[in-house]
């Protein structure tokens, strides 16, 4: 035993020494903001064209892989995920059903690398393979395309197929004739329908609307600027798109360069199009135009709703507009107003607010309006509004999340998918005649005996200011509150996004290996509505990471765990949450994982996807202070003992520029007074986590999984005695 301990100590010592000898060069830049001097020690790492920068990133990634290779069960997660996929047999995703009952979907068999596009004429029709992305550009080397979005025409005669690779959001869109499988020679290349507003077909199926980017250089600062909604007619030159909703086409609408003009979903029978100017505000400005006018080339968009109306999820229903209203409401109301004489502040209230339940989403059918509510973002319910009455619909089992699906306002067809932290998503069709939900799964229901002993406990803990923070606890029924449990705390807290329950196999595998998972629903998210979002927004952003700190202290106090058994995990904007929790309370956590994280928000405005409306702008003195306060990079201090940290990024990340995690890692390595590892791993074949083959995603997650178990002391993840140094 003494020999084993000695070898592990030697391993850590050599590890620490090796990393300290490969620090990044520092070329500081000093700037002054409203009288405050800010020193950016690693501004040089923002130059991704510099070979020295790329070589240092590659050397650190190689070093990280060397360290991870010492962990005996590094590959456990990816191997187990592939085993679970094999057990399931196949998976179905991105299902689209046309009004004439044609089914289009992506299907991946367990032995395949990526999903293919399939078609059926009706639920019980014969399955037909339409397209395999492996065949796209297969005459060229080093391509790895995945289908990330599909959109059939109204009659199902044609389908648009969006494909991307290596984490890029920009896609190639091709159009196929479903009957003949003929693919049009024209390819759209400056759009990203999986991320930006999808594809919306013309009534006559001769073309579609989509969002077009002004440049295909995703690293350009102007990449997300001056986007426009365009009309593409099949068979025409993709370079000659027809602008129908944009700053240039509609200057009178005063659309700014950093806003995204998009079309809302519509039905064939609708007489109008609704356009929305999308930014990162909770409520947005909308406009309306008749279909006839727009297709005749007219530009007479009329103002519809204003952000002050607090109207969301607008949908045309005959001569009315149905919407979710937050006006004078903390929990939302379901309302409608006349399309010819609209009044969003004084509408007809169909469903008044339900105390404690937030109205989230709805679908309109010819039989009524189905809608969902959530409590604390984790307890979902389903209702139907019909003939002026509001009635609950019994769910097959308690669910944390419900997704709604319908054919349109003139059809009865309505489906839901229920899921939870420990329940795999199942699909049900509502039978109007008997008022009941019947199973209609397209993916096999699989048995997971290794997850049968897992339970979920939804609790609230009191933050330092008295606010009640929802926390989802997921653990084995055999858990003991002895302070020894290895806890993984996941957290986000931005953009008003709710961390809704889903069947997270990563969580369940963590638990099956002896750990416990906590999801902290911190302020800045949408679990408790707009107020919750504004509680972790710009100047109030410190609540976001302090809620995480308070949740961690609660779990320690209640003997679920202890400081040396806690790992925190945050992805994307969740990087702010875990980064600032770590820099404010470095003593509280054993390990920190920042996955493609926002680590240097003070510099966000210089990137293609800067978010001044969510986090703040350096042009405003108050917001500058807020940005500096939430900046984890600028809160790293010399001589502080920081926890073990795993920092990941994607070289093709269009959401969070890769130099944010890179700079954070470089500064942490240079200033950390502890011998805890700081690992940087950049995926040179990926981006923000999506648009890559599943096995690649599993491998990336598996490395973070193994790192956390290693640091929390799991015996199966400790370096072996015969490890090569």
Regions found by a protein language model. Give the residues of each.
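Surface-exposed acidic, glycine/proline-enriched linker/cap segments
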Residues: 139-142, 246, 253-256, 452-453, ...
